[in-house]
Design a protein with these regions (language model features):
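Basic, alpha-helical terminal appendages of large translation-related enzymes
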Residues: 1-2, 66-72, 262
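N-terminal regions immediately upstream of nucleotidyltransferase
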Residues: 1-17
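Hydrophobic, Leu/Ile/Phe/Ala-enriched alpha-helical segments that form helix-helix packing faces
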Residues: 15-23, 74, 78-82, 269, ...
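Active-site nucleotide-donor binding segment shared across nucleotidyl transfer reactions
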Residues: 19-65
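Conserved NTP/Mg2+-binding pocket subregion across the NTase superfamily
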Residues: 68-188
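Conserved nucleotidyltransferase catalytic core and NTase-mimicking acidic/glycine-rich helix/loop elements
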Residues: 132-303, 308-310
Length: 311
């Protein structure tokens, strides 16, 4: 059983009745779910994931103005829930960084993930918050939220402004062009195979980020990036190709093939840019398309920032 399903079942079996019986006046002010750090929040957990920080548990997101006495009573009631469920024991010690389950103030949760308690109100906040943090703030599942405040903030983080999306996309495109379409071949010509591999890793990193932005999805922490990419609607088939590019050698025959693959990937990304009417450039150079994407930004302030300001 996956961690997300385990969490929901634990809540439905024990948590829901506990809250209804012991906190009836508070029940409709809480948001319940599993959101945040950990592979189980993304649905990526497996048997290996159970060797650390894995337990039956759920989050009780409470209003920021909850009184300390009620918060303490909630914490005690949650702690008294069964110590084992479906053959999985609850953790006796909180993981590094604090408990991922139990009673959490809504504002504290979002502040820890994004730097904001209630949602972003400036472009600067959007531009300086890593997509992996936004992924962790908006993953998982909300089982119940009668008040709707937790879900309102969650949705606000899911709705990245188009100008921000374009600025980040332009930055990743130009970085991908620099690393993959230019520096990789330069390094190979100089006999710098290590440098060539670093260039290819940079290309894959930025091109993958561009693919996530084209899908309007947040790219998660790097160790889950390939897993998440394979689930995307658009260009998900490139995941295996990127994996080959960063894991293969740079002997002459392979390096030549990799350079061709880079151009193929660029062509596929450009086609998607054109489908979404994000570029007017007519060429195979990702750098030129990056500037064309940047030209579509409506905010003069954001458009005139350095093209790499979003990466």
């Amino acid at each position: 059983m996956k961690g997300l399903e385990l969490s929901r079942k634990f809540y439905e079996t024990y948590g829901a009745s506990m809250l209804h019986e012991k906190f009836p006046e508070l029940e409709d002010k809480l948001a319940i779910g599993l959101v945040g750090d950990g592979s189980e929040c993304f649905g990526y957990d497996d048997d290996i994931s159970r060797d650390h920080d894995f337990e039956p548990g759920f989050c009780i997101f409470v209003p920021d103005d909850i009184d300390s006495r009620t918060e303490f009573q909630l914490e005690r009631a949650y702690a008294k829930l069964p110590k084992s469920f479906e053959g999985v024991d609850r953790l006796k010690i909180s993981p590094v960084g604090g408990s991922r389950h139990g009673v959490i103030k809504t504002g504290d949760f979002y502040l820890a993930k994004t730097g904001s308690r209630t949602g972003f109100d400036s472009i600067d906040q959007w531009m300086t918050t890593p997509d992996s943090c936004l992924a962790a703030a908006t993953n998982g599942e909300v089982f119940r939220d009668d008040l709707g405040e937790f879900s309102r903030i969650r949705q606000s983080f899911l709705d990245m402004p188009q100008d921000v999306r374009l600025k980040k996309l332009a930055g990743h495109l130009i970085m991908a062009a620099q690393a993959g379409q230019y520096n990789f071949k330069r390094c190979i010509s100089h006999g710098e195979t290590g440098g060539a591999q670093l260039a290819m890793i940079e290309f894959a990193d930025h091109a993958m980020s561009a693919v996530f932005l084209l899908n309007r999805k947040y790219r998660p922490f790097y160790k889950w990036a390939f897993r998440a990419m394979r689930e995307l609607e658009k260009l998900s088939g490139l995941a295996d190709t990127f994996e080959f590019l960063i894991s293969s050698d740079n002997e002459p025959v392979t390096a030549s093939a990799k350079a061709d693959i880079v151009e193929d990937i660029a062509s596929m990304i450009i086609t998607e840019l054109q489908k979404q009417s994000l570029t007017d450039a007519i060429c195979g150079d990702l750098e030129k398309h990056a500037y064309s994407v940047n030209d579509r930004i409506s905010s003069t302030q954001l458009r005139t920032m350095h093209i790499m300001a979003g990466v």
